[in-house]
Amino acid sequence: MMNSDKIVMRNLMVKIEKIHQISHRAVRVFTLVAFSLVVSDLNADVRFKPKGHEFELTGKLVGDQLGTSLSLGPKGGFAVWQDNSTDPFGYGIAAQRIDTVGNPVGSPIRVNSLLEGDQEKPSVGMIPEGGAYFVWQGGASGFHRVHYRVVNSLGVFISEDNFATTPDSGEQTEPSLVVLNNGSAILSWTDYLADGSHKGVSARVIGKDGQPLTESFRLNQFNDGNQHKSKVVALPEGGFAAVWVSDQQLNQKSLDIVGRIFSADGKPLTDEVVLAPEGINANPVVSLTGNNLVVAWEQLNLNQQQNRWDIAMRSFDLNLKPLSDASIANIKLKGDQFATQLE
């Protein structure tokens, strides 16, 4: 991929979880198409130009740096990733502080204080007045727990690792994070057997001091089968929207994308809403654009096997009322398009 393409994606804050070349191309196509759909003039001549050269954010590091997440605020931000050299026991979580123009500040730091097992799938969110939340899943396989840690505006961790619930809770995976307008954070995750069926999705509100502001609460209403892969986004009035995958809501062969709106203290403001057409859907992401929500997901083409996975998208108001039909975002159809993210 050309350097200019990578710079375009960085400027649009499109972050890639998988490192295959095809996912880079798919996300680039989706980003350009999605952007063209939300600008006020659909006929505008939108051109993207690089504003610098590609550079190594961390310098040369030992091992593999994977699963990068990036968050920037008015005072800079952090990039966070998992690698196999940060701690001596499998994967650890490392972070690099970034200034307001994207330059690295200092050297990478280790985020996790607990070392047992693998620490994976990190996310980071900036506190408006400075500081950040980090969240990840850690522990031995089959005994994962969601961990989090808070750093203050001086870049100092205010505590050791915290558990989203308790160290003896059931299996917890697939953490997601968003910082609300009041500076508190929503942590969401997938748990096992906690909703009376198989997998479910839960969340908890965490304060800037690292202390929980609520008990954990259930995101999903529909319990049959698996509810998993939740993503959350902050809303302008202080609450948040959550989306996730729900097995077999529309029929016994469907994998559905659903969503729900919550207040800033975790109280549901709507029922669950099925967001995607009936079919095989996966890995939703959600973003706020103005006063609308854009939801994108991977959708399996059941009619033409050579095309396989596409990127679908749809827009909604802040109560999850649809503003458009679902549409395919990618121009390239043959093969798999996957691992999209948007900001």
Q: Where are each of the predicted segments found?
A:
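N-terminal secretory signal peptides that target proteins for export/translocation
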Residues: 1-24
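Extracellular, repeat-based ectodomains that mediate carbohydrate processing or recognition
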Residues: 45-343
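Bacterial N-terminal signal peptides
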Residues: 28-41
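N-terminal compositionally biased or targeting/leader segments
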Residues: 8-10, 16, 29, 88, ...
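Alpha-helical and His/Cys-centered functional microenvironments
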Residues: 24-28, 100
